[in-house]
């Protein structure tokens, strides 16, 4: 945040590093430290925001769109696209980040798209100008104009993917740690990691042209690698803790986002009430076999059966 804040300040104020230091009453050396990523205090951040008159806008978002007014207008449109994606979702689950944390989602989205080399529109199309603050007040023709816009279509498709991915997470993963009899910080940390990267997972699953970008495949490899590792560990913890799974968690990586949405909807509607993941059945079988291994010698001894030959041929009969 400190690097982007300084970059934005020098851009908006059209000043040198030395001049900016004077305006902020700090040394030029401190500006250099911030540019290298050193933490900027909350009070200093507020001072810079007030100087630039950017309110609560993320400086990275402003830099991406090239101008404060453009960023504000796109923020308004994207916030409504997020709400629309949630409302049009068919999983039954509320996708809380799209409703309650739209600004945070926008910041993460901008960071991820910039990372893979996406070029944001540096102007705001006049046909998207609108005085209404909520998409339910938009006319049909204006909505059609929005979805025909290439950038808006991209964002909406990512959000639709996020609805399915997040719903699967809520349906099958988010509350697993509450079922632990003994608190396990590593188990809880895994679930936090899984949730934190869901937007990136949605980006690589969305039906877009982003795979053509130079950085997309790198992001895809990293995200799939991380999730495979996290989910395998999570399954192992669940198995050892006798926590039932109602779905194969690796579907989160391997399946298309539409299929994840269908699985989430099935859980929401209660279709999985009597279904358990095969790992749970296997665990029950293993426990039963171990119990027999403990009990049988005691039974044989009590019955004074000393010589017992195993009939291997009969074991192979069905």
Model-derived features: positions:
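A short, Lys/Arg-rich alpha-helix, primarily the initiator
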Residues: 1-13
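Short alpha-helical "recognition helix" segments of helix-turn-helix
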Residues: 9, 16-24, 31
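Recognition helix of helix-turn-helix/homeodomain-like DNA-binding domains
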Residues: 24-40
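DNA major-groove recognition helix of helix-turn-helix/homeodomain DNA-binding modules
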Residues: 42-60
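Helix-turn-helix/homeodomain-like alpha-helical modules used for DNA recognition
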Residues: 61-134
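Long, charge-rich C-terminal accessory regions
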Residues: 111-277, 281
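Alpha-helical oligomerization segments
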Residues: 260-318
């Amino acid at each position: 945040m400190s690097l982007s804040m300084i970059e934005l300040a020098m851009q908006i104020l059209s000043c040198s590093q030395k001049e900016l230091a004077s305006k902020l009453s700090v040394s030029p050396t401190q500006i250099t430290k911030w540019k290298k990523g050193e933490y900027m205090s909350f009070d200093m951040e507020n001072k810079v925001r007030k100087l630039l008159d950017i309110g609560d806008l993320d400086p990275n978002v402003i830099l991406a769109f090239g101008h404060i007014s453009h960023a504000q207008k796109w923020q308004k449109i994207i916030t409504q696209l997020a709400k629309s994606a949630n409302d049009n979702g068919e999983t039954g689950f509320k996708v809380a980040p799209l409703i309650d944390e739209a600004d945070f989602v926008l910041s993460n989205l901008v960071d991820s798209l910039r990372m893979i080399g996406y070029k944001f529109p540096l102007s705001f199309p006049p046909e998207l100008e609108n005085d209404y603050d909520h998409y339910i007040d938009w006319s049909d023709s204006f909505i059609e104009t929005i979805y025909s816009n290439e950038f808006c279509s991209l964002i909406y498709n990512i959000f639709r993917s996020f609805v399915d991915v997040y719903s699967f997470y809520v349906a099958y993963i988010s509350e697993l740690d509450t079922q632990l009899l003994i608190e396990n910080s590593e188990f809880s940390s895994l679930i936090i990691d899984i949730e934190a990267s869901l937007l990136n997972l949605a980006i690589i699953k969305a039906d877009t042209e982003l795979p053509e970008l130079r950085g997309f495949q790198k992001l895809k490899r990293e995200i799939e690698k991380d999730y495979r590792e996290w989910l395998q560990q999570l399954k192992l913890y669940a198995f050892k803790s006798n926590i039932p799974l109602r779905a194969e968690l690796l579907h989160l990586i391997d399946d298309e986002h539409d299929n994840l949405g269908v699985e989430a909807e099935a859980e929401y509607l209660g279709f999985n009430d009597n279904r358990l993941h095969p790992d749970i059945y296997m665990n029950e079988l293993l426990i039963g076999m171990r119990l027999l291994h403990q009990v049988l010698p005691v039974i044989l001894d009590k019955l004074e059966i000393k010589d017992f030959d195993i009939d291997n041929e009969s074991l192979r009969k069905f």
